[in-house]
Amino acid sequence: EDKDYANTAVFISHAHLDHTRMLNYLDPSIPLYTLKETKMIVNSLNRNGVFLLPSPFEDDTFTREMIGLDAGDVIKVGEIEVEIVRVDHDAYGAAALIIKTPGHHITYTGDLRLHGHNAEDTIEFCKKAKHTDILMMEGVSISFGDRKEVEDEIKPENEEDVIRHIARLEQENPNRQITFNGYPANVRRFEKIVEGTSRTVVLEATMAALLKEVFQKDAHYYYRDGAPKLDELDPTLEISYQTLLEDTSKYLWQAVDHFERLQEGSLYIHSDAQPLGDFDPNYQPFLDLLAEKHIEFVRLSCSGHAKPDDLDRIIAMIEPKCLVPIHTLKPELLVN
């Protein structure tokens, strides 16, 4: 109770669990900063209290206060200045930090890449960070070089490729129920799916509400059984769940639960949705359920992390005086 947090602040880079899960455990007197979009996404994902660990002092749906910033905003923490800079990642609203102390220039990349819809954000960040004294650099993609590749799995080169593959699957299956799911924090991918496919895309209602909040974009939507109505959604865009269950040609819709109710022999596109992969104990039972219904499972994955060659490009663009690898199991593979 007697701690002095006058010159203390915490920054969130983006809305993934490994960066946000324990937010509610941060002392309420410490300011918590992030980009506005990340604040929107975290609040949306924790709408029902299932995303963040609950505070022991609040109800289960509590999300602690965050201060939403615009890209380029500078926050003073004592004698330290922190600029929050937008980067491209598969969680929309991701940010890096450029930190200036009285004697040094320090850069933290957060998680970033060069193969997303907003790669120019990462390039502009690199320009801002040029010749930083210390570069704290993520290296997730170099951690798993020995992971076995899945035969016949589609391997999109970039986010645009994901949308092209979805459009192709629609064309190849004109009279077949097609559903999909993705990771909700990747709001940009959902936006591009809505824009870039031939069928009418129908999102689960909370995802449609998040798309509208972040991009001011309306989309058709449906409510899960028993879900409360959302005032921010246009009632004329609602499609009934039963209509979607019976459809074979008009809709591409986001399936988030009750996969046993999908049509036998239908097509399901798994685009970085949960369960995320074979490391998740729920993954194999999920695949088994689809197999029992003879539902074709197509995985369309596009990493939010810079590819190994792009990590080298980013380091070369920044030319840091000192490189500090983080967020990787093989830091020795990142070279300045």
Residue ranges and their predicted role:
Residues 1-9, 18-188, 192:
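His/Asp/Glu-rich metal-coordinating catalytic cores
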Residues 12, 109, 254:
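Short hydrophobic beta-strand that contains or immediately precedes a catalytic carboxylate
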Residues 37, 87-90, 110-112, 139-140, ...:
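Active-site metal-binding loops of divalent metal-dependent hydrolases
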Residues 39-43, 144-145, 208-213, 276-279, ...:
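Short, charged/polar "capping" segments at the starts of alpha-helices
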Residues 194-199, 225-336:
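C-terminal regulatory/interaction regions
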